[in-house]
Design a protein with these regions (language model features):
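Hydrophobic faces of well-ordered beta-strands that scaffold small-molecule active sites
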Residues: 1-3, 44-50, 88-90, 129-131, ...
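Glycan-recognition patch characteristic of GH18 chitinases/ENGases
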Residues: 2-76
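Solvent-exposed coil/turn segments that connect beta secondary-structure elements
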Residues: 6, 44, 51-53, 93-95, ...
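Substrate-binding surface in catalytic domains of secreted glycosidases
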Residues: 12-30, 96-202
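Surface-exposed acidic, glycine-flexible loop patches that form ligand/cofactor-binding
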Residues: 37-38, 78-82, 120-121, 189-192
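Helix C-cap/helix->beta junction micro-motif
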Residues: 42, 83, 124-127
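Structural recognition of alpha->loop->beta junctions
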Residues: 65-92, 147-169
Length: 202
């Protein structure tokens, strides 16, 4: 199970990234220990999702500097340790939908370094690293998709890739996830990593 319980924020006072607990805000009268106990008693693997709650280019700039990149890593690892989660899922959509696509080439290598460093820290504690992103296509083709997420480069470091194979049509009526479109991104994904790592969001 992958509950949306956390979001990454930037604290302007401390000038540091923080992982904010949105579960507590939404459920002030129900301690998080209650659902955690129920889920664990049911034998569930618990991998919460962290969304990107920062403003335009904030996360990209944090990942561009070794010190602040490590701060992001440390904040995420501390969140996993706080409730002994089985791992974490990153749903950082700001690169795709908030930052200008002209920044993607500069952001991608810093994203790869971040994933590599986070992976090492989590795997040292035997935790799972899952990444959720919009679609990518083969970069050799004209239509590349959201190449900022650099699937081929992060593939060795992640345990799961969750592809957002939906929202094909947004501003106008149309299909949510056409089969040909979905198959194209899946074929690319399984050409660069084991199929066992690839999950579809429908």
């Amino acid at each position: 199970i992958m509950p949306f319980w956390y979001t990454l924020k930037y604290d302007g006072k401390t000038k540091k990234p923080v992982v904010a607990d949105v579960y507590k805000t939404a459920n002030p009268s129900v301690p998080i220990t209650e659902p955690l106990t129920a889920l664990r008693n049911a034998g569930m693997t618990i991998i919460p999702t962290i969304t990107d709650g920062t403003d335009q280019m904030i996360l990209a700039n944090l990942l561009a500097k070794p010190v602040s990149r490590k701060q992001v890593v440390d904040a995420i690892v501390a969140t996993v340790a706080s409730q002994n989660y089985d791992g974490i899922d990153l749903d950082f959509e700001g690169f795709a939908f908030i930052d200008p696509n002209t920044t993607w080439k500069a952001t991608a290598p810093n994203w790869v370094l971040f994933v590599k460093e986070l992976s090492a820290a989590l795997h040292a504690e035997k935790k799972i690293l899952s990444i959720t992103t919009p679609y990518l296509f083969n970069p050799a083709e004209a239509q590349k998709g959201y190449f900022v997420y650099a699937w081929a480069q992060i593939a060795p470091f992640i345990d799961r890739l969750r592809i957002m194979t939906y929202d094909y049509s947004t501003s106008r009526p149309g299909p949510i996830g056409p089969i040909a479109w979905t198959e194209k991104t899946v074929k690319y994904a399984i050409s660069i990593m084991p199929a066992s790592k690839v999950y579809l969001g429908l």
